[in-house]
Amino acid sequence: MIDLSPLVRRLAGTPLACWSQGLQAQLQAKLEKGHGDLERWRGALDALPALLPSEIDLVDGLRLDCDCDDGTRAQMRQALMGLSPWRKGPFDLFGVHVDTEWRSDWKWSRVAPHLDLQGKRVLDVGCGNGYYQWRMLGAGADMVIGVDPNWLFFCQFQAVQRYLPDLPAWHLPFALEELPANLEGFDTVFSMGVFYHRRSPIEHLLALKDCLVKGGELVLETLVVEGDEQQVLVPEDRYAQMRNVWYLPSVPALERWLRRAGFSDVRCVDVSVTSVEEQRSTEWMRYQSLGDFLDPNDHSKTIEGLPAPRRATLLARK
């Protein structure tokens, strides 16, 4: 049983107080529906050793440590491996280095210098396993709620949270569509790596805006293409072997969409081509990764002949 009463207490007196009252029942209904692998993943969580971190670093990475013996480390490693594949990270947990598919710390180092999260109430949409939530706390956020309907990511978050139970981070296994309309309760809303999976991009921007307080900030990170404000790529079928990629706008086009959705102070703070060093297969994620999805003779193109992944981060104000 995951007790959300600390979250309810945290949200008392905020615009999110009313919403928080129904979260425990909403979570319980989701858990009862469950997932075929949930029991196995819960078994991995139960196998984690009971440890109290004496060192916690959420600023320069995500590292927890304490004095523990090799047997305990082996137990930790085996339990964490039971929650594979690990996509976002890396995590250093009591001497076990979880070398995830993505070097999410690289993305964070590109995005974080442009943000002021001090004292902010934050929503991370499509939060994955919560890696960025912990980094947001490290950057001074007052509290962070992540939503992502993927059950494995939910369990991976629980694995870290059991060693940081008093920190104000919560992962709810919900889709953005399961949040009420017009929440208007978050100072900062993140949508990183979600936008291109949405069939209706403007609707997504409007839904994100609805979650923000007036004057709140959106952090939008997504795949883009080069070009002017009329340039948008809609893949015929797959993009880098992904079926569920719909719209890859140019940065000027995306800036226009944000303004059209009612945002102001729109600006692009980073554009980076994703390298095979930043996204790759590892011991902790053994499936195919970016290197398998690019043209083997020309890494500037995907295997389908489309422009290789290029990601931009934009900030905008409600």
Swiss-Prot record:
Domain of life of the organism encoding this protein: Bacteria
Pfam families assigned: Methyltransf_9
Keywords per UniProt: Transferase, tRNA processing
Gene Ontology molecular-function annotations: methyltransferase activity; transferase activity, transferring alkyl or aryl (other than methyl) groups
First and last residue of the signal peptide: none
EC class name: transferase
Swiss-Prot/TrEMBL catalytic activity: carboxy-S-adenosyl-L-methionine + 5-hydroxyuridine(34) in tRNA = 5-carboxymethoxyuridine(34) in tRNA + S-adenosyl-L-homocysteine + H(+)
Any GO BP annotation: tRNA wobble uridine modification
Subunit structure: Homotetramer.
Name this protein carries in UniProt: tRNA U34 carboxymethyltransferase
Protein's organism: Pseudomonas putida (strain W619)
